[in-house]
Amino acid sequence: MQRECYRFGGVTFAIEADAPIERSRMCAPFHAADGAPEHTIRLHFDDGLPVPPETAQHRGAVWRWQSGMERHLLEQYGTPDKPPQFTYAVTRGAHTEVTFANAYRAGASVRAVLEAAGIFDIFAERGMLVLHCAYIVTVAGEAILFSGPSGVGKSTQAALW
């Protein structure tokens, strides 16, 4: 079994999988020594597409719902006439089970596993807020954050300071 540990925002995540997972260059600076993680993500592959309940929140290709103490996140891609393409995560406390459709077995990456697990939701449950930002540090030592979606000019604005 492959096991990789990564540390983000003071939280160590262990990713475990029976199949190889590609390391992501974007995640490389956060790679951590194997140790006791605060959260474990276990990846497996299966083409059994979960059926969200009618009460699930649905936006585009994403469904979210709670079932008791479990948080569910389903992202479905593709069309019904092709093999299933989806990621599905169930989080119970400090453990997340992630299922990728078999179509993703080749090329599954650390970054894709973290995103499928709903890492931002995991942080939110710990009282942490994640912002997509560019930043500068002023001469006085103050930080200025430019937050917003990709492509709106955060880095461009930061470069003008």
List each language-model region with its residue ranges.
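A noncatalytic interaction/capping subdomain that flanks phosphate/NTP-handling catalytic cores
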Residues: M1-L145, L160
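P-loop (Walker A) phosphate-binding loop of NTP-binding proteins
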Residues: P149
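Hydrophobic positions on the alpha1 helix immediately C-terminal to the Walker A/P-loop
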Residues: Q157
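Conserved glycine(s) of the Walker
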Residues: V152-G153
